[in-house]
From Swiss-Prot:
It holds the Pfam family Globin. One of its GO terms (molecular function) is oxygen carrier activity. This is Hemoglobin subunit beta. InterPro entries: Globin (IPR000971), Globin-like_sf (IPR009050), Globin/Proto (IPR012292), Hemoglobin_b (IPR002337), Hemoglobin_oxygen_transport (IPR050056). Involved in oxygen transport from gills to the various peripheral tissues. Red blood cells. GO terms for cellular component: blood microparticle; haptoglobin-hemoglobin complex; hemoglobin complex. Keywords: Heme, Iron, Metal-binding, Oxygen transport, Transport. Residues 3-148 form the Globin domain.
Amino acid sequence: MVDWTDAERSAIVGLWGKISVDEIGPQALARLLIVSPWTQRHFSTFGNLSTPAAIMGNPAVAKHGKTVMHGLDRAVQNLDDIKNAYTALSVMHSEKLHVDPDNFRLLADCITVCVAAKLGPTVFSADIQEAFQKFLAVVVSALGRQYH
């Protein structure tokens, strides 16, 4: 279990309320696939991923990006028990999909970049970023739990 300060809880929940998951999700997953092209191997059923434009316009990428961000809502709702909230997803990504757990960190970085670009430095201040990155690190750890 993670010990969250009241300020961190407030920052995470407050920021989450400002994030358009249906906008950030597709952007973040597309960014991951463009910036870290080796991650594309996990999305072979998504169709054309041959260029950045193809990735950005790919409806399967957009749909899965939304799914990922809606999945993060589970962590926001379960701040005190993120690891258990993500047990089934961890098992699926480890045992069925064989996703390199470092890819979760890469996607978390892309989510952070997209949120920062959308909300700007006034809303996404350094202290908000610190809490959000701690939150994403806990989610990444929970997703990687079955790998250990």
